[in-house]
Regions:
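Structural signal for interior beta-strand "rungs" in well-ordered beta-sheet cores
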Residues: 56, 123-337
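Terminal amphipathic alpha-helical/low-complexity segments used for targeting or macromolecular assembly
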Residues: 1-127, 193, 199-200, 205-221, ...
Length: 367
């Protein structure tokens, strides 16, 4: 939880930095006296920040923007500060020297986002439908036309957006935010500080069917999905993303998992802590993905696989076998003009015969 400062005024730079956890700041180099601002009211890019805002620079290629920025303070890398301090021109803004400026920016942005939230008492819109058996903490807000099923437990500071549908016996952790029109099926457990975006469907039935010739030739019989979905703390799930419940055991998203929009996670999957997936990824059922992995957009991962920790998959890659070794993996045919692609694709189809001919030529040349 960020440190609470005086709500009646913007914090000074030193007050703001003291309120940010993590010990990220190496030092602060003061700017010109007439450029200092008594209060920091927000954070912005170098181009958009005003004189009462702090900004950041993460790459030397943006150095040219420093001359025109209106920010009263800028977060900089140590090597960038070395360049600035060696300049003959006085630097008007203060510099916050930090090895991880993007992370410090994120934490300052989190602080401002949190600080603007007023203290809340229980607020349930008159059109919301809340089952009498549900347990609702005193600081929860529930928007218009939301539905809260029997046996639910909604913990402190949770926010349920308009039109959300929450099934029976669902638990939602403290300080979690459900944007409008999220659907959560029965029995799903969500940890603290989750952010679930609109259109997400959590805990729907997995794709489980058994061939049933007693019904008809080629017919399928449904396999009831008896497991649930368990989501850890600090998980964010993007708009229109779907995560299925397990067939027998639970589908699990561990702490810190980040899912972009329009992702599909099949039943019985386990996604390790702090793994992040970009948009339109599909993960088939019963696959385990380790911790700290990144999965590029539109990648497809087959079912019943085990992918280890610290594996990074490039966008558009099809993963069809286990991956045990950490590293970056790519399986994308290079983009090219269509005519060139057709020629290369034709060659790909002949690789086996070309290989045989090459071996024959090598054998003949050796004899």
């Amino acid at each position: 939880m960020p440190v609470l400062l005086n709500p009646d005024r913007a914090p000074s730079l030193s007050e703001l930095l003291k309120a940010i956890p993590g010990g990220l700041v190496i030092k602060v180099v003061e700017g010109l006296d007439d450029w200092k601002n008594p209060g920091i009211s927000g954070i912005g890019s170098l181009g958009s920040a005003g004189p009462n805002e702090i900004s950041f620079i993460v790459h030397p290629k943006y150095l040219g923007q420093l001359a025109s920025t209106q920010a009263c303070a800028v977060i900089v890398l140590p090597e960038i500060e070395e360049q600035l301090s060696s300049s003959a021109e006085p630097i008007k803004f203060s510099r916050v020297v930090c090895k991880h400026p993007y992370l410090l920016y994120a934490r300052i942005a989190q602080w401002f986002d949190w600080a603007k939230e007023p203290a809340r008492d229980l607020c349930i819109h008159e059109t919301a439908v809340v089952d009498p058996s549900a347990t609702i903490a005193r600081s929860v807000t529930i928007g218009p036309y939301a539905v809260i099923g029997p046996g639910c437990k909604i913990n402190e500071m949770a926010q349920i957006g308009s039109g959300c549908v929450i099934g029976a016996n669902v638990e939602i952790g403290a300080s979690s935010l459900l944007h409008p029109r999220v659907t959560i099926y029965d029995g799903v457990k969500i940890g603290m500080r989750a952010i679930i975006h609109s259109g997400a469907v959590l805990g729907a039935d997995g794709f489980g069917f058994a061939p049933d010739p007693t019904l008809a030739k080629g017919a399928w019989g449904k396999i009831p999905q008896l497991g649930s979905l368990v989501i850890g703390n600090d998980v964010e799930i993007g708009a229109n993303t779907t995560v299925d419940r397990g067939a027998l055991e639970n589908t699990i998203l561990e702490d810190g998992v980040k899912l972009d929009n329009q992702i599909m996670i099949g039943h019985n999957c386990r996604i390790g802590s702090h793994t992040a997936m970009a948009a339109c990824v599909g993960v088939a059922g019963s696959t385990t993905i380790g911790s700290r992995c990144t999965i590029g957009g539109a990648s497809m991962i087959s079912g019943h696989l085990i992918i280890g920790d610290d594996v990074h998959v490039s966008g558009g890659t099809a993963v069809t076998s286990n991956v045990s070794k950490p590293g970056r993996y790519t399986g994308v045919f290079p983009f090219s003009e269509h005519a060139d692609w057709q020629k290369n694709a034709a060659v790909m189809q002949q690789l086996s015969s070309i290989r045989k001919r090459l071996r024959t030529l090598e054998r003949d040349s050796d004899s």
